[in-house]
Amino acid sequence: MGCTLSAEDKAAVERSKMIDRNLREDGEKAAREVKLLLLGAGESGKSTIVKQMKIIHEAGYSEEECKQYKAVVYSNTIQSIIAIIRAMGRLKIDFGDSARADDARQLFVLAGAAEEGFMTAELAGVIKRLWKDSGVQACFNRSREYQLNDSAAYYLNDLDRIAQPNYIPTQQDVLRTRVKTTGIVETHFTFKDLHFKMFDVGGQRSERKKWIHCFEGVTAIIFCVALSDYDLVLAEDEEMNRMHESMKLFDSTCNNKWFTDTSIILFLNKKDLFEEKIKKSPLTICYPEYAGSNTYEEAAAYIQCQFEDLNKRKDTKEIYTHFTCATDTKNVQFVFDAVTDVIIKNNLKDCGLF
């Protein structure tokens, strides 16, 4: 008897081949789908990274979209100068020129218009005079002692431009805006033949309980830390050092049972602010045991070790660390390229294709 296959056997073989082919295609498709979860304490730069993805991997912000940020730029500018003026009272700092006290009173009267998206010439003049005052500058230089937006100097130094009647925010202006993220913001884009879904989760503590169970099985976590937070306290808890809070959160994320097989990418962000700050504010404020120099390289390397040492699965889990400046598009582009290569490698490995 020959070994020819019956029609039934042939159909079974074809079916088997088709199942194998479908499984392979599903595996390749799964390898091309990337879910990224952005985590980190409040104001660590997560939302700025999301904005950069829109600029780098999509068409950026249209003129119409930029116009919609005008009120946010004005609101951030006003909030910043008001925060400084209020802190002067608390820190007992006087105006360099006593006439500025009248400007400060005017500021509170006129502030409402800017919150609505209008900057009158009168209000711009008041803010400019206040910002130039030596007492205001002295208070600004002590901003670690109160809560102040990182973008304060960026906007206040550029008041002539942003106060123009026909002002339209630039991409950089949009990147610098600060709006507290609540809930979950989802962004989609394609890069290197991968389909990315990026989830930005509200950083403040009250939001954290919304996270973990939803995100089992994400491809990678990008955990953002603001390097420049080492000498600051939390907005939600004036006793807690921000860097210590970040470390606590990183520990619980990195060693979480839901994320055993998830790649952890650590963005040590705001390196530009850290480089300036470390010259004046010693790292021992945060790490009393630190005995190194207050140079950028040595202090940054020490912080990196503090975070990487929290990983309890060193033998099986690698932390991929990058120093970033989330407002610098070229830097984020370069880093994200490297991150994507790691994701591709790990993804193919998981799908048995590498």
Curated annotation (Swiss-Prot):
Pfam families in the record: G-alpha
Subcellular location: Nucleus; Cytoplasm; Cell membrane; Cytoplasm, Cytoskeleton, Microtubule organizing center, Centrosome
Record-listed Mg(2+) binding positions: 47, 181
Protein name as catalogued: Guanine nucleotide-binding protein G(i) subunit alpha-1
Domain G-alpha span(s) in chain numbering: 32-354
Post-translational modification (record): Myristoylation at Gly-2 is required for membrane anchoring before palmitoylation. Palmitoylation at Cys-3 varies with membrane lipid composition.
Function of the molecule: Guanine nucleotide-binding proteins (G proteins) function as transducers downstream of G protein-coupled receptors (GPCRs) in numerous signaling cascades. The alpha chain contains the guanine nucleotide binding site and alternates between an active, GTP-bound state and an inactive, GDP-bound state. Signaling by an activated GPCR promotes GDP release and GTP binding. The alpha subunit has a low GTPase activity that converts bound GTP to GDP, thereby terminating the signal. Both GDP release and GTP hydrolysis are modulated by numerous regulatory proteins.
Subunit structure: Heterotrimeric G proteins are composed of 3 units; alpha, beta and gamma. The alpha chain contains the guanine nucleotide binding site. Part of a spindle orientation complex at least composed of GNAI1, GPSM2 and NUMA1. Identified in complex with the beta subunit GNB1 and the gamma subunit GNG1. Identified in complex with the beta subunit GNB1 and the gamma subunit GNG2. Component of the TAS2R14-GNAI1 complex, consisting of TAS2R14, GNAI1, GNB1 and GNG2; within the complex interacts with TAS2R14; this complex plays a role in the perception of bitterness.
The species this protein was found in: Pongo abelii
Residues annotated for GTP binding in this entry: 43-48, 150-151, 175-178, 200-204, 269-272, 326
Keyword vocabulary terms for this entry: Cell cycle, Cell division, Cell membrane, Cytoplasm, Cytoskeleton, GTP-binding, Hydrolase, Lipoprotein, Magnesium, Membrane, Metal-binding, Mitosis, Myristate, Nucleotide-binding, Nucleus, Palmitate, Transducer, Transport
Span list, region G4 motif: 265-272
Principal EC category: hydrolase
A Gene Ontology term for the protein's cellular component: plasma membrane
Region: G1 motif, residue numbers: 35-48
Presence of the UniProt keyword Cytoplasm in the record: yes
